[in-house]
Amino acid sequence: MRPRPIRLLLTALVGAGLAFAPVSAVAAPTATASASADVGALDGCYTWSGTLSEGSSGEAVRQLQIRVAGYPGTGAQLAIDGQFGPATKAAVQRFQSAYGLAADGIAGPATFNKIYQLQDDDCTPVNFTYAELNRCNSDWSGGKVSAATARANALVTMWKLQAMRHAMGDKPITVNGGFRSVTCNSNVGGASNSRHMYGHAADLGAGSQGFCALAQAARNHGFTEILGPGYPGHNDHTHVAGGDGRFWSAPSCGI
């Protein structure tokens, strides 16, 4: 696990009469921090103020949806659309339950503080990195979508993996590959419509969990494509991806 960034208490800033601008991470927006007692920390990636609940909308909701994307319910995928509807409320409740918080579906200080504990200054979850999700090139270019979109999709994938990791006892999950440019995909014999070229996909090593346990768990954490043992070319890894449609096939795992 990478070290977490040092958090600055807003109450200390207010008490000292100091004014600091929020720190902006590369390619990640930062919300204006409120100096109210409702917010416990100024985060290096993104800081929420107040609370979010059903009916809320905007960038703050979209940022929340990215972090709870791994809690949509079995077989579902949460839309990252900035609209706090019933599906987002349910995802927030599952996130809260997973971390022992009051599961009211309202994102407030306790929920945000837990997210701050789970994310690094580049907005990735603490147990995964952009480098793990891109072993093809350094700039996310050359895929089926823009580099920015591929990178953003990979961020959502990482938060899904973080949720899955927590559900499986917080044991490390081995990521052997993620984003591929069209060239990288061709070089490894990938399918012409592979979701790797969109930044949606990750190939997982067996780790301590085993391929089948990973494939089975992925069904609960927002992955619409799961391929594993028994599916051609997938006896040596478990492939998980988001994106449109749903296709699960790991016959040796009962999927």
Curated annotation (Swiss-Prot):
Cofactor(s) annotated in UniProt: Zn(2+)
Domain of life: Bacteria
Post-translational modification: The N-terminus is partially blocked as a result of the cyclization of the first two amino acids into anhydroaspartylglycine imide.
Example GO BP: cell wall organization
Any one Gene Ontology molecular-function term assigned to this protein's record: metal ion binding
Signal peptide positions (record): 1-42
Co-factor: note: Binds 1 zinc ion per subunit.
Protein purpose: This enzyme catalyzes carboxypeptidation and transpeptidation reactions involved in bacterial cell wall metabolism. It effectively catalyzes the transfer of the N-alpha, N-epsilon-diacetyl-L-lysyl-D-alanyl electrophilic group of the standard tripeptide substrate N-alpha,N-epsilon-diacetyl-L-lysyl-D-alanyl-D-alanine to water. It also performs a weak beta-lactamase activity, hydrolyzing penicillin into penicilloate at a very low rate.
Protein name in the entry: Zinc D-Ala-D-Ala carboxypeptidase
Source species of the chain: Streptomyces albus G
